[in-house]
Swiss-Prot record:
EC number: 2.1.2.11
GO molecular function per UniProt: 3-methyl-2-oxobutanoate hydroxymethyltransferase activity; magnesium ion binding
Gene name linked to the record: panB
Compartments, as annotated in UniProt: Cytoplasm
Protein known as: 3-methyl-2-oxobutanoate hydroxymethyltransferase
Cofactor list: Mg(2+)
Chief place where the protein resides: cytoplasm
Length: 274
């Protein structure tokens, strides 16, 4: 039923049934809107570094940042599954560090965590799952490691990269993930992985053959400075908001705001107060 709480187990069971709808959101108002729209998953992404905090990349995002924004999203959204990104440096040092970071996110409302990387981090995935926290994998273009793996370019367009993608996906499944995000890989490679693994795949810029799709909230509504080519802008909210603030500024400068309807009056005369 649409009103039922979405869990990691429910997402797992959705593979092959109906498309999973996921949105990346970062704060109370965007999460509240996404929940009202009926999405299945809200990802509190470390992309908040660029989208919300103005950083040049995700590398500047800290665990404290993720905890703060995850808590805000969790206060707003009640039905969707809330997944929190594990930021750069929060799980790489050791499995114990990974569990500690995941627990910090779970304590403020994350119902699952997402981490980037393949077989090299399978032990971190297993440790977090063994601690009782569901894990979503992330393969293909992994922004935290984009420079190391050749920059922001499409992945798995050739056989060797596609084979590596599949092996990493299988490794994550063995470690216990309940789903895998495939970012900016060829549609054919995404389709192959989707067919070959038993967990749902959720695409971002990876074509139409996955079990679900995810886009950043700000890209959907037109609030991003730069919309990626694989995203679709459904409304130009930036233009609407600029127009609204411009009208407000004009009203203040011309004495039209506040109006009588915005004013609170005293209950008795105040002129003779000394």
């Amino acid at each position: 039923m649409p009103g039922d709480k979405v869990t990691a187990r429910r997402i797992l069971k959705m593979k092959g049934s109906r498309p999973i709808v996921a949105v990346t959101a970062y704060d109370y108002p965007t999460a509240w809107i996404a929940d009202e729209a009926g999405v299945d998953v809200i990802l509190v992404g470390d992309s908040l570094g660029m989208v919300v905090l103005g950083y040049p990349s995700t590398l500047q995002v800290t665990l404290d940042d993720m905890v703060r924004h995850t808590a805000a999203v969790a206060r707003a959204a009640k039905r969707p599954l809330i997944v929190a990104d594990m930021p750069f440096g929060s799980y790489e040092p050791s499995s114990s560090a990974a569990v500690e970071s995941a627990v910090a996110l779970a304590r403020v409302g994350a119902e699952a965590v997402k981490l980037e990387g393949g077989s090299e981090y399978a032990d971190r995935v297993k440790a977090i799952v063994d601690a009782g926290i569901p894990v979503m994998g992330h393969l293909g273009l992994t922004p935290q490691r984009a420079m190391r793996i050749g920059g922001y370019r499409p992945r798995a367009r050739g056989r060797d990269e596609a084979r590596r993608l599949l092996l990493d996906a299988e490794s994550l499944v063995e470690a216990g993930v309940f789903s895998i995000v495939l970012e900016f890989v060829s549609e054919e490679a995404a389709e192959m992985v989707t067919r070959r693994v038993p967990v749902p795949t959720i695409c971002i810029g990876s074509g139409r053959r996955c079990d679900g799709q995810i886009i950043v909230f700000h890209d959907i509504v037109g609030l991003s400075r730069h919309t990626p080519p694989f995203a679709k802008k459904y409304v130009d909210a930036r233009r609407i908001m600029v127009e609204a603030v411009t009208r407000y500024a004009e009203d203040v400068r011309n004495g039209r705001f506040p109006g009588e309807e915005h004013v609170v009056h005293a209950k008795e005369p105040l002129e003779d107060i000394s």
